[in-house]
């Protein structure tokens, strides 16, 4: 049986690339601990000089986030008193970031995420909505071949450590207070309401992960639960679901299994 033309063309293509940078014993699941951000986290901005990114970076810097610089394709110099570099790879080499916040418009966000994966940035937070589905599917295929980079999003409010005063995203800062409740949510708005209620109750938050409402997401409920399970700062967990998909059911199965395997959960 002849090989389909498109398959043969792909096999011959000199541009075909492999994104696996780790041994076969490791996988994308091993990157889940990259979600544990804090004061130590060095944050890079892609699309750094844009209006939205600039305002967001100013707020995050004031909050205490350790922003080390940004990327503008073909750019250089400084912005907000921080270095601007032309590529993510150069930023990785010079600034040693632990995470990148991608403030790039949806049509170009996929390429920005790919660049961050190729540079092996440990944590990638993509906030843009309406990234084309074929871009996200391609990105997920890339992520599954490696163990260095972890994606939050796309279409996500981001991730924030209230204890470590580190925000990578656009969550409303006045609602957060340091504490020991971990939160993972699909809906950004519902997560803000949950955070505000916990703050009013005097409890506070440890780590809050906004996974985004898209069906295909870089991080899901189970990933967040695995982080909270070993996080000494988290004593209670809140899951905020949304209609659509099976993520909540998968989380319920994980929790049942957790109670079976832990003698003192």
State what each model feature region is:
Residues 2-265:
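Catalytic-core regions of core metabolic enzymes
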């Amino acid at each position: 049986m002849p090989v389909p033309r498109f398959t043969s063309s792909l096999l011959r293509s000199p541009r075909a690339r492999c994104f696996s940078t780790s041994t076969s014993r490791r996988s994308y699941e091993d990157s889940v601990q990259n979600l544990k951000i804090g004061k130590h986290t060095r944050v890079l901005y892609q699309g750094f000089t844009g209006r939205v990114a600039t305002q967001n970076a100013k707020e995050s810097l004031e909050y205490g986030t350790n922003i080390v610089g940004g990327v503008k394709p073909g750019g250089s110099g400084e912005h907000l008193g921080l270095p601007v570099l032309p590529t993510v790879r150069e930023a990785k080499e010079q600034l040693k970031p632990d995470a990148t916040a991608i403030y790039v418009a949806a049509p170009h966000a996929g390429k920005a995420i790919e660049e961050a994966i190729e540079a092996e940035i440990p944590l990638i937070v993509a906030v843009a909505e309406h990234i084309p589905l074929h871009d996200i599917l391609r990105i997920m295929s890339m992520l599954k071949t490696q163990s260095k980079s972890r994606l939050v999003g796309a279409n996500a409010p981001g991730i924030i450590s209230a204890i470590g005063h580190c925000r990578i995203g656009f969550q409303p800062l006045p609602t957060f207070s340091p504490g020991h409740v971990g939160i993972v949510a699909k809906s950004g708005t519902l997560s803000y309401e949950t955070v505000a209620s916990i703050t009013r109750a005097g409890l506070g938050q440890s780590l809050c992960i906004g996974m985004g409402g898209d069906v295909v997401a870089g991080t899901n409920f189970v990933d967040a639960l695995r982080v909270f399970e070993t996080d000494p700062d988290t004593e209670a967990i809140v899951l905020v679901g949304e209609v659509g998909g099976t993520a909540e059911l998968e989380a319920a199965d994980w929790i049942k299994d957790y109670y079976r395997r832990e003698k003192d959960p």
